[in-house]
Design a protein with these regions (language model features):
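Short, conserved "switch-loop" micro-motifs in signal-transduction and mechanochemical regulators
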Residues: 84-85
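Acidic catalytic/metal-coordinating carboxylates
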Residues: 35-38, 61-64
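Active-site beta3 strand of CheY-like receiver
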Residues: 46-52
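Receiver (REC) domain active-site loop signature in two-component systems and cognate sites
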Residues: 57
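Two-component/phosphorelay signaling modules centered on CheY-like receiver
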Residues: 12-31
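C-terminal output helix
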Residues: 88, 106-115
Length: 120
């Protein structure tokens, strides 16, 4: 079964970078959202197998979107990404139910390792 992944980042180049990493490694069912608001509505409609989400975004932050997605679906699998490697953000995201936290800049192997650990 082709796992469905939602990429959420306000930076189009970052979504493209992650998408390219995933598609070249067999993950081809990928949806995208440019902010937390779109992420919540897309997750609600699509119930993806995994969400990879930035923290700092306009309209609705990744933390706010994480709260809403987990309230809607407590079993949702969410991995947070951020350039801010701040311990408080990591702790908050994990407390809210994020399965992992990836600090940017990251290597492609880190994304793949995390996705495989969660989906395979």
């Amino acid at each position: 079964m082709d796992k469905k992944i939602l990429l959420v980042d306000d930076a189009a180049f970052m979504r493209m970078l992650i998408r390219n990493t995933l598609t070249t490694n067999g993950y081809t069912n990928i949806l995208e959202a440019a902010d937390g608001e779109i992420a919540v509505s897309t997750y609600s409609a699509e119930k993806t197998d995994l969400v990879i989400m930035d923290i700092t975004m306009p309209n609705k932050t990744g933390i706010e979107a994480l709260k809403e997605i987990k309230a809607m679906d407590p079993g949702a699998k969410v991995v947070m990404c951020s350039a801010m490697g701040q311990e408080a953000m990591v702790v908050e995201a994990i407390k809210l139910g994020a399965l992992d936290f990836i600090v940017k800049p990251f290597k492609a192997e880190r994304i793949l390792q995390t996705v495989k650990k969660i989906l395979d």
